[in-house]
Amino acid sequence: LLGSLGEAGHRVQVHVAMRYGSPALPDVMDELMRQGVQRVLVLPLYPQYSATTTASAFDAVAQWLQRTRRLPELRFVNDYHDDPAYIDALASSVRAHWQREGRGERLVMSFHGIPARCVERGDPYRDQCLRTAGLLANRLGLPQGELVVSLQSRLGRARWLEPYTEPTLRQLAA
């Protein structure tokens, strides 16, 4: 990212900050302020928007803002699920895998799951996942039904978005 921006003539810094790891978001924001950075673009690495993911990163920035005295100009990227560069990157990754391993009968695209109640409350996550999958299938020239969407990483007893990945894989293997 930094290289591409530099080639385009932009003078920027790229920093990684994590919600649940190191370097922690508040520490990175503090360092940016020490360096005199005046504008910050927050780009969560969640292509599809969800209150459970993207918004939690925005919440972390808001918590940091509550304890700072210097307010930088902030911009946020909500999602990039249908950005052509993102779809191209996915397609390139799939094609590279096919070259190394061969092409299977189906391509399974497994997204991280979220509780179904989030979508019922208006979260666009499922629709954006399906849009990403459709654009990828189109970019790869896959016929209808060759790309299968599933969702993984279910926690707890609440109903999560379906279809779940494990049963989907078992069904495809049968």
Q: What is the meaning of each model-derived region?
A:
Residues 1-174:
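Extended amphipathic ligand-handling, pore-lining, and cofactor/metal-binding catalytic surfaces
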